[in-house]
Design a protein with these regions (language model features):
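Short connector loops at secondary-structure junctions
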Residues: 35-55, 156, 181-207
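Residue-level detector of conserved catalytic or cofactor/ligand-binding positions
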Residues: 215-221
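Short N-terminal binding/cap micro-motifs at the start of the first secondary-structure element
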Residues: 14-21
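Short, structured active-site "lid" loops
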Residues: 53-74, 207-212
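Short mixed-charge
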Residues: 93-117
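Extreme N-terminal starter segment of soluble prokaryotic enzymes
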Residues: 2-7
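Short catalytic helix/loop segments, enriched in acidic residues and glycine
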Residues: 22-36, 169-180
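Hydrophobic, aromatic-enriched interface-forming segments
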Residues: 142-177
Length: 221
């Protein structure tokens, strides 16, 4: 497999609570023949995609990262599902919503306007579509034989389906395929692709807790 470089946006969580995930992803990338080249001076994506049509300033950090990848001629890779959701949706805005594109570019004052040219990929998409799970399986040194793992997708990776284009929103399989590739057995259970209530946890705490409890108590099918 040819060595490739991807622009990489780690995001805040992978710099704090999930440092191990960042380190393992970089090491795995090297072992599989590609490199994650971290975006310079990246800023927080905001963690939540702004739904207001007049929200421009909160999208600028994503536009900046996307433009840096464009200038390098590289695809942009993310790992955090929240970052991936925000950046991919902002990229879609810059590509398809003229008012947002114009106003964001006016704020940024870039040498060349950004118009959604960068391809945004989740790390799992690189493994599935660029590396291939068969190749990954061959590279595994210590397969997780005998382990049973249940994947939780949530909604950020999958919806809205036409924009995220990550997997089938109703019946995703990419994480289960990854689990098989590393030697473990995937466990299918209800609510694995349902919302955990993260977006409403501050305003509707009880509702969010109820949504989360459904995921916790669901039994494998």
């Amino acid at each position: 497999m040819l060595s490739m470089k991807y622009s990489y946006y780690p995001g805040c969580t992978l710099r704090n609570k999930a440092k191990d995930l960042d380190e393992y992803a970089r090491a795995s990338a090297r072992a599989l023949g590609f490199e994650l080249e971290e975006i310079e001076d990246w800023q927080c994506c905001g963690g939540v995609y702004p739904l207001g049509t007049d929200e421009i300033a909160t999208k600028l950090s994503s536009v900046r990262a996307l433009n840096q990848a464009k200038e390098k001629g590289q695809d942009l890779v993310t790992i955090c599902s929240a970052c991936h959701h925000v950046i991919k949706r902002v990229n879609d805005d810059m590509k398809n919503v003229e008012d947002i594109r114009t106003r964001a570019n006016n704020y940024m004052q870039l040498e060349e306007p950004y118009a959604g040219e960068t391809t945004v990929l989740h790390f799992l998409e690189v493994l599935r579509d660029r590396v291939g799970f068969d190749t990954l399986k061959e590279k595994v040194v210590n397969p997780l034989k005998g382990k049973k793992i249940g994947a939780y997708y949530g909604c950020l990776l999958l919806r809205p389906g036409k924009i995220m284009a990550f997997d089938n929103p109703e019946n995703p399989s990419v994480i289960e395929d990854f689990i098989r590739a590393i030697g473990a057995e995937p466990v299918i259970y209800p609510y694995r692709n349902e919302c955990c209530g993260g977006y409403i946890s501050l305003k509707e705490k009880e509702m969010a807790e109820n949504m989360l409890s459904l995921i916790h108590i669901s039994e494998p099918t």
